[in-house]
Structures are given as C-alpha cells and as structure tokens.
Amino acid sequence: MASSKLREPVDEVFDLDLAVPETTRLDSSLHKARAQLLAKGRRHRPSRSRLRDSASSAEDGEGSDGPGGKVTDGCGSPLHRLRSPLHSGPGSPASGSFCLEPPGLRRSLDEDEPPPSPLARYRPLHNAASHEGLAATSGSPPRSAPSSDSSPSFVRRYPRAEPHSEDDSRDASPPEPASPTIGLDKKTRRKFLDLGVTLRRASTSRSRKEKGSNRLSMGSRESVEGSGRTGSSPFLPFSWFTDSGKGSASSGSTTSPTCSPKHEGFSPKKSASQESTLSDDSTPPSSSPKIPGGPRQETKCSYPYHTLSQSSDEFLDESLPAVQHWTSQQVGQWLHSLNLEQYAAEFAARQVDGPQLLQLDGSKLKSLGLSNSHDRALVKRKLKELAAAAEKERKAQEKTAKQREKLRRRENDAKKS
C-alpha cells in the first residue's frame, strides 16, 4: 500500500505531457532546400566517369516516372533531372523545376510536348530588367546534337579556347546547349552573391576580339595624340640648333611651330656686338612688355633657346635691353601694341627713338599729345617696366661676364698646372 501511494505522485510528477501539450514540429524543409541548393552550386562540373556511374545507378534505381528518375531522349541516352524542393509541390509546373543536365547530353521534354522556345526555360530567372543580359544570350536556338567544341574533352585539350579558371566553370553561365543550366530566382541569386559565388557570363571569343581591338585603337589614339603634342611642343629639336647656326633654309621650316608671328614682327635688329655675346643672342617670347621689331629675319628665329646657363629670371627678361636701340618706327609699333596708335604719328614726327622714350616724363608726354591722364599713366607704367627690365638685364650681363672671366681664369690655371 505504501509503495503504491509513492508511485502515484511520482507518475503524476513525470507525466509532462499534461503540463506541456504536444505541438506540431516546425517545417524546416525550406531551409534544407536552400542549403542543398547552395551546396549544388559549388559542385564541380561532372566528368565522364561520374556520368557513367550516375547513368548506371539511375537504371538500377527508381522508374522513369518519378521526379528523381531518368528521362530518355530520342537517342536513348539517360538524362537525369533533379528537382529542387523549393519549386516542387503538387501544383508547381514542370517549367519552374531546378534542372541539372550533364554535358554532352541534350535535354528534351516529354515527346507529346512541343519543344519550348529558348526563353521558356528561363521563367524563374525573368524578373523584369534585372536578368536582361542573361536572357539576351539565350536567344540562340538549341542545336540538335552537341558539337565537339562544347565537350569537356575539348576544353581540356585546348585550354586557350576558354581561358577561365575553375570558378568560371562552376558559375551559372547563360545557356549553351551542352552546358549545365541552372535556373535561379532573384532570392537565390542574392544568396549566391552573399556567399561570394560569382554569377557572371563567360566571355566569348568575339568579345575578346572586340576588347583587343579596343585596346589597339586606344593605343593608336594615344600615339597619335602624343605625336600631336610633340608637334606643338614649345621645346625645339636638336636639328634646329645646328641649322640655325649654319643659316640654312631648313631652319625656317623647323622653327615654324615655336616662332609666333606676333613676336617675329616685333623682333629688333641685332648689331655685331649683340651677336658676339651669349645673353644678347636670344629674345624669348615670354617677356612682360611687347617688344617691337624691325625687318623680319628669315634664316634665324629671334629667340633661339641656347642660354641654358642662365637663370629663369634672366632668361625671361633677356630681350629688354633692345629698347635702347629702338628706332622711331619701333616706338610706333610699341604704341600700337598698347592700343595707343592715335599718338604714333606725333611720336614719328618728333623722331622719338628708344633712348628718348626712356627719358620721357609727364610734361614731355603732354607735349607729345597725350592729354588723357589714363594714357599717360599707362605709358609711364610701361616705361618703368622697360627701365627696370633694362637695369636687371644689365646686371645679369655683368654677372655672366664675371662668370666667364672666372671660367677663363680656372682654365688658364689648369693649363699652367
């Protein structure tokens, strides 16, 4: 009696079904199907031995009517169709199934069904314009028999025909008739992308040729642009220096890109003493005031670039001392460059040359007809610039003369020693 009394409360305590009622288990088939689908996407491309094994196992397995059975095409070769649980169901159509074909075999539906259009097998893929690129390549009609170019042995024998890594072969490429075709919806494609699996289209030989031609055209365009840039370059070739010293007729043609007509018209005449010195031998175009010039020199440009030992400041202001040697005609050209051509006749009548121009002040300018204060201020400012540049050039000439003297002394000392 005592033992039966003890058993009753124990049974009541351990009978948990009364406290926690039984519930239906959660449906995890969707998660399992996703895991299987992701695992299938990472599999290697089936080889010939695997195809034979799968064919023999399918013959020994279930009948041809089951979803995992074999379907024979017109040639009698077994063709396996695996359906994903994602799309399988009592009311799901056969076109939405997940189909995996081995290479070298042609997929065919039941004999009573008409052959589908090339876009019909991509119903799960089509989601507006997101898969437009994949559908465009599938527009080629399926061939009746697979060619030898698409077989795996051809790919192994000629690796240059499709130079892609093994990852490319595992990607879901657009449907070649002999390549495995995987129909993926938008959510599954996003899963693949999250896992780092690339779903890109294998490039054909035509696209590679187009890329190569584009690269060639880009290179030729760059070379043409580079030649155009060198043609208009401000730097001169070495043949210019040699021809200009000889005074040959070809120097005029070689210096045509660099000698601008503005500064050629304003280049001053040079005396024999200027030709003998190095600093007076060139008049570059980049000086701040515009310098008038005399008759145009034909065989020689007015600013050859062979004053390499000078500094940049000396090089820019090299032609400014020529104002001391200006004639009245060059003074008139200088006034034209300042848009003061209305006073050029009075300056020419008074025979104002370069040295007289540097000595002009306010009263002399008024006597020359410059009644406008703005014009007088402009002329004074330009004259100050000319005078400052002339002084600077004089100091630069003295400096170069001292450097030459030092070099001569060093050469003499080296010869004596």
UniProtKB/Swiss-Prot annotation:
Keywords: Coiled coil, Phosphoprotein
Basic residues composition-biased segments: 40-49
SMART domains in UniProt: SAM (SM00454)
Spans annotated as Disordered: 36-302, 390-417
Residues found modified as Phosphothreonine: T283
Basic and acidic residues composition-biased segments: 159-173
Location of Phosphoserine modifications: S84, S108, S173, S179, S279
Domain SAM: 326-389
Bilayer-spanning residue ranges: none
Coiled-coil zones: 375-416
Pfam families on file: SAM_2
Ranges of Low complexity composition bias in the record: 138-153, 244-260, 276-289
PROSITE patterns the record matches: SAM_DOMAIN
PANTHER family per record: NEURABIN, STERILE ALPHA MOTIF DOMAIN-CONTAINING PROTEIN 14
Name of the protein: Sterile alpha motif domain-containing protein 14
Name of encoding gene: Samd14
